[in-house]
């Protein structure tokens, strides 16, 4: 299967020169369409920097990043913004919902920037909320929902436009164990429908929910293995 994401020898260097810091140091990674991959590492490992690269929130100092066949590693800010809007659905630890908007309005908001008509925006948003089990909460504002429900709204917002990549950064970090389990089950169900899911975490138990685990340490990929076959793929 051709790679949806292909990173070639990527480095991210801060303070070049005598006191330089290599947050990423020669990272190579391929992710195929439809994979469910967990990227795990402790604080300072480089996982957040790698997430920023994968999400087109930053560009590498060296190396190339191909997303859906396009080299995004040298794109300007406006072009990267367009890629983020069309190619990637983000789920963050903080739900990032607008308090004054209802659930369906929060889900609709990013679709406006894609130039989608009002009728289609509503249809896509309602469908996304149904997928995450919140059809009964569409007209509720964030303050009227639990943390787990708010994160489900955030997932609906990420998937509404059907982007090729779902990028989830510590999506259970602010949730209790019950809500965390619900969110992980939703991500698994999304993967079963053929969506590409990339989960960023520091937690081994959460990483174990993915089909593939990529461990990063000191800016390098330390391990890359399948959860149902622990033999390293490197």
Listing of model-derived features with the role each one plays in the protein:
Residues 1-13, 223-234:
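ABC-family P-loop ATPase nucleotide-binding domain
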Residues 2-216:
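ABC family nucleotide-binding domain
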Residues 213-225:
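H-loop (His-switch) and adjacent beta-strand-loop-beta switch element
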